[in-house]
Amino acid sequence: MNKVVKKIAAVVLSGLLVASVFAGCSGGSAKDTYTVGICQSMQHPALDKATEGFKKALTDKLGDKVTFKEQNAAGDSTLCSTIVNQYVSQNVDLIMANATDALVAARTATNTIPIVGTSVTSYGVALGLKDETATKTGINVTGTADLAPLDKQAAMVKEWVPNAKKVGILYCSAEKNSKYQATVVGAKLK
């Protein structure tokens, strides 16, 4: 199964999880409608598919009981903050944060509105949690992660170039998750 299909499947499962959260939080009296604010960090085919899959899963589960407010930050992290702050002031029922900048902005904006993230490599790294490898955040954030199997990547490098004295790892130093992956793989190559 390719990476995009896996990501879409994870988003659909995440959407179903969110639908069950809505149902479980009703306390016996379901709301008539739910409003979900979606903040996508930028336009990109993989991110677009993740958002589409999320919306489809919720719509399939909740029908016309769910409405979406969707905005794209066009790669501007400051705009992510503006978008999620609007959602917080509008008191949406849930925020879907698509990519790391959107997730960080959402968590900074609220600790009460549930946040579902996708297209995030490591929630622990992105949110500065003590346990960077945590699958449970212990806060109002959940979602799907796209962390590659770093140990297998390091093993593959060792297999392909067993006599290498040095290995260069390219990464974006401005992206916490990128630096985290480079550090982990680098340590496994030693």
Protein language model regions, located:
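Short, low-complexity disordered leader/linker segments with a strong preference
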Residues: 1-35, 59-63
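Immediate post-signal peptide segment of exported/extracytoplasmic ligand-binding proteins
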Residues: 26-36, 60-64, 133-137, 158-166
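Extracytoplasmic "Venus flytrap"
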Residues: 33-55, 61-63, 69-80, 174-178
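An alpha-beta-alpha
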Residues: 36-40, 54, 142-189
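Stable alpha-helical elements in mature extracytoplasmic
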Residues: 43-54, 79-83, 91, 98-102, ...
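Short helix-loop-beta junction
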Residues: 57-64, 186-190
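Loop/turn elements at helix/coil->beta-strand transitions in domains of secreted/extracellular proteins
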Residues: 64, 90-94, 111-115, 139-140, ...
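Beta-alpha junction/loop-to-helix N-cap segments that form part of ligand/metal-binding clefts
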Residues: 72-131
